[in-house]
Design a protein with these regions (language model features):
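Feature recognizes metal-dependent phosphohydrolase scaffolds
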Residues: 1-178
């Protein structure tokens, strides 16, 4: 539970977000032009990952009593995010969609996140490095395999000659040796 000072801070943050005209314009632009994935000129574009199992198959996530994987999961995530923005103000559908944005931000099988946990707080405030672990989705083990790429393309109705444009590939720190 929040104390009274924390409640005031949270209320001010919410008010600032809701009343920011510039932020609302950006959000409207993202919903008007963006999506969880996009197909253009035979190319498949997405930001995060197509959640996978350790065996390289599409991971299955369950929502509202239904199982989703691959393209169906991405379509469902896109629809739920839009529900959170476009459903009538104060409706259960809008609240549910807004709550779903949290899952998209840091959910284990979120196609926008691609990690097992969000440990930003732990990295900032906890010295014990064992609390900082964010295991990457198996997608990042498989995404350079031709057969997996062809399977992803087929899942989205594209031929094996198409391209995948992956907008969020974790950057690895390289140790350079100077001679």
């Amino acid at each position: 539970a929040l104390n009274s000072d924390e409640k005031v801070v949270l209320q001010k943050l919410v008010q600032s977000f809701r009343q920011s005209e510039k932020l609302q314009q950006h959000v409207e632009f993202l919903y008007a032009k963006g999506s969880v994935y996009h197909i253009e000129n035979g190319n498949l574009l997405y930001h995060g990952a197509v959640p996978m199992t350790k065996k390289g198959t599409f991971a299955v996530e369950r929502f509202e009593g239904h199982a989703y994987s691959g393209r169906a999961l991405m379509d469902y995530c896109d629809e739920r995010a839009r529900r959170g923005y476009f459903a009538p103000e104060g409706s259960a559908a809008r609240q549910s969609g807004q709550d779903f944005l949290w899952y998209l931000w840091c959910g284990k099988l979120s196609p926008l996140y691609g990690r097992s946990a969000m440990t930003t707080f732990e990295r900032l405030y906890v010295e014990d490095a064992s609390t900082h672990t964010e295991v990457k989705d198996p997608y990042y083990t498989w995404y350079n395999e031709e057969a997996v790429c062809r399977r992803i393309l087929a899942e989205f109705g594209l031929p094996g000659t198409s391209h995948i444009v992956n907008g969020h590939v974790p950057v690895q720190e390289l140790s350079l040796i100077h001679i």
